[in-house]
Amino acid sequence: MSHHFTVNTETAADNRFQLSTDWSDELASRAFDEITLAAETLESHGVTVHLFEDSGIDAPDSVFPNNWFSTHAGGHIAIYPMKAPSRRRERRSDVIEMLKQNYRVQDVIDYSGLEPDGIFLEGTGAMVLDHIDRVAYAARSDRTDPIALERFCTHFNFEPMVFDARDGDGVPIYHTNVLMCVATCFAAIGTGMITDARRRNEVVARLQRSGRDIVHLSNAQIDSFAGNAIELQGKESRILALSTTALAALGDDQRATIEADARIVALDIPTIERAGGSVRCTLAGIHLTPRN
């Protein structure tokens, strides 16, 4: 978590979820407190949380670690090529070493060498991964290059499912994980933002083929980060972590579909959301086997 959290001007050009605001030490402190409380809340529900401090001033988006690395069953870690130079500075060897010390890690595949060629794939922001059916859902953008996506899918045995998605103003969706999330028994997705009707139907059909219920999200709900959620394993059940902003945007029927399989845990992070990301962005999931 960052002590110098602020809106990243390098990423503002293609992330319309970011809000222009005058940032101060007070807002940075508030964001720090939000992440601290969010971690405590998840731990109280039985989720294992590894929280890292970031006292530097040159990585304003370090609160969003899911973009630079991901972990995978079988002991695999991927490190990703990032578009903004400031975001490349988020990569930390101590995080990878912690994972090696606490979990069984077989190999680390580093794609960051693609950056000088202008090829980017920003982790589980660029891709929403179905770890059960092995599908990588990806909305095309400057941060999701098809070459890098193909390499990842080949290395990690995922089927790529690529589509174009735009908001109501015609602006491309910068990260797939603001548009959709895939849980064990359901998927929430802003289908109306997928521009091609045929491809939209194919995406929905692929999700349904896996046996999942579909929670269709409106554009307004996507704007409220309702798609930026993540399923986690709690002490007694699966939980769906999302923000209080996202929860307030959901309808009763949508909540009922989610709660039929997972307990909803809402985290209050309004300051962090001003920087263009919500709960899913703040969490890098661990799919590795613990050593003990």
What role is predicted for each listed range?
Residues 1-292:
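The feature marks the mature, well-folded catalytic cores of soluble enzymes
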